[in-house]
Regions:
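Short, acidic/polar
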Residues: 27-39, 86-101, 124-125, 149-153
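Beta/alpha (TIM)-barrel catalytic core signal, keyed to glycine-rich beta->alpha loops juxtaposed to Asp/Glu
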Residues: 118-301
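Structural motif
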Residues: 38, 42, 100-101, 134, ...
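Active-site mouth loops of central-metabolism enzymes
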Residues: 19-30, 79-88, 112-118
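N-terminal binding-site loop/beta-alpha segment at the start of enzyme catalytic domains
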Residues: 1-73
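CE4/NodB-like, metal-dependent polysaccharide N-deacetylase domain
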Residues: 90-110, 132-133, 157
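A structural motif
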Residues: 13, 44, 103-106, 136, ...
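Hydrophobic faces of well-ordered beta-strands that scaffold small-molecule active sites
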Residues: 14-19, 47-49, 75-77, 109-111, ...
Length: 311
């Protein structure tokens, strides 16, 4: 796919993105700074945050860190997770994000999730206004289904806008995006930047040895990943990683990035120690044979037509 995302000085967005959801929360200032520097040194140029992350601390800390490198980095944030995708909420969120990060322009602004109660024409008319004023450069959508994304793309076009980014959940154990979102994004020339390529940490192998994290601390993540077939896949991934002389997190991120539509997985962590295996995926060469072996650990979802015999 043609490079869709560049920084203000034209630097291409990196193969992986770094998500700062933990900044100012489970990662304090020092840990956040260390992870930012590690990501930067590994070649990451695409950083992702959101208006709602850690009550604004994520954006504030990221803004402080990017200042010396601003023009060569892509900074993406999200609006309207709460409060709806109304013009007033989008404008207020964008302005708050700019203020927190001390940025004149937000490289990318996502609608954080689909709002069934707001006419998307009003939402994208607001995006057009923000782009015209130089507040944003790119437009993204997050947690949209394929039909919602296609509808959004059509409405955006009415305002001479293009949706550049879509952010779905995607990992070895959460593969629904393969059915319609990934092919739709490729067809519409939208860059797919999936989140949770490690399955909430399940694919790191830490829970098998009694480790703690979001799956043990957050009921939402427990409900999302607490299935036997997922635990079995994670265990098998760890065995394959041992055989390959790598870390399961490296293989999991590299597998997600190796999909034929060339997505840009968003990696994240609480510390540099956690982050290092994911960063190693930047240079990992995923062979077709290994990709297929890992894909076979979890059944592929049926096609949208549900005619599995034709898959």
């Amino acid at each position: 796919m043609t490079q869709l995302l560049t920084s203000p000085d034209g630097t291409p967005a990196s193969r992986l993105a770094f998500g700062t959801m933990q900044f100012g929360g489970r990662a304090d200032r020092a840990a956040s700074q260390a992870m930012f520097e590690a990501a930067l040194n590994a070649g990451i140029t695409h950083f992702d945050t959101a208006h709602v992350y850690t009550d604004g601390a994520s954006e504030t800390l990221l803004g402080e860190m990017v200042k010396p490198y601003r023009d060569r980095l892509v900074i993406a944030t999200k609006a309207a997770y709460t409060g709806g995708a109304t013009p007033q909420n989008i404008r207020a969120s964008a302005e708050t994000s700019r203020s927190r990060m001390k940025l004149d322009t937000l490289d990318a602004l996502y609608l954080h999730r689909f709002d069934p109660d707001t006419d998307m024409h009003a939402s994208f008319e607001t995006f057009a206004e923000l782009k015209r004023k130089g507040v944003i450069r790119y437009i993204g959508i997050s947690n949209f289904s394929a039909w919602q994304a296609a509808k959004a793309a059509g409405i955006a076009a009415e305002f001479d806008l293009k949706i550049t980014l879509i952010q779905p959940m995607y990992s070895l154990v959460k593969r629904q995006a393969e059915v319609e979102i990934l092919p739709m994004a490729q067809d519409y020339e939208i860059l797919c930047a999936p989140y949770s390529p490690l399955g909430g940490g399940l694919l790191t192998g830490k829970y098998a040895s009694g480790g703690s994290g979001r799956l043990t601390e957050d009921d939402r993540y427990a409900a999302r990943y607490n299935f036997e077939h997922m635990r079995s896949a994670a265990a098998a991934l760890s065995e394959i990683a041992l055989r390959e002389g790598g870390h399961p997190a490296t293989l999991a991120v590299a597998w997600a990035a190796a999909h034929k539509t060339s997505p840009t997985p968003i990696i994240s962590a609480r510390s540099t120690q956690q982050l290092e295996p994911s960063l190693a995926a930047m240079d990992y060469v995923m062979t077709p044979a290994l990709y297929a072996e890992l894909a076979a650990l979890v059944p592929a979802p049926p096609p949208a037509t549900d005619r599995a015999e034709e898959q």
